[in-house]
Amino acid sequence: MKSAVWSNGWTVSPHKSVNAVEFACQYHKNKDVWDAAFRFLAEHDLEALSIGNHVIREGKCWATVSEYIPKEVEKGNIESHLRFVDLQYVLWGNEKMGLASDVDVRQAYNSKKDVAFYTSSRIKHHSADAGSFFLFFPSDIHQPSVRGKGELVKSRKIVIKIEYVD
């Protein structure tokens, strides 16, 4: 991860919470798709991208750009995905991302939406800013889009869905 060969010119680093071993495994198993995702981030003006979906590789990788007010921690969804890795990058705003443990299933996995929802009283939150991105693999039960400390402000985020390879 330190060599940043994977970055394809994008200068943002993975957050310290990212599972480096899983990242390396997935990158090598699906290199063309990961390279396309990182090239997309490096080659586009992320501030100018329109809100909505942007196809990177049909059925394998796409970006969703959104602007929103982050939720209070009690109202934020705790979720996981099996078919796609989440790359989440907050361009601006005041929010944090959580990694949950000791979870109970609230809503069973929906294969059409590639999501399961959980409850948990044990979530470790990390500040999200433009200096780093988060990767959430199928084993990472996460709580995105949670309001950070301080002023309640709008966030702009890009979520890239990247096909997970067993």
Name each region found by the language model:
Residues 1-50, 61:
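N-terminal leader/capping segments at the start of a protein or of a new domain
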Residues 51-72, 78-91, 99:
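A short glycine-rich, His/Asp/Glu-containing loop-to-beta-strand
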Residues 82-96, 101-104, 109-115, 161-162:
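Short, conserved beta-strand element in jelly-roll/cupin
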Residues 87, 133-135, 152-166:
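A short hydrophobic beta-strand segment most commonly corresponding to one strand
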Residues 87, 124-125, 149:
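Short, surface-exposed secondary-structure edge patches
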Residues 99-102, 144-148:
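A short secondary-structure junction signal
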Residues 114-124:
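Acidic, glycine-rich flexible loop segments
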Residues 119, 127-147:
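Conserved metal-binding segment of the jelly-roll/cupin
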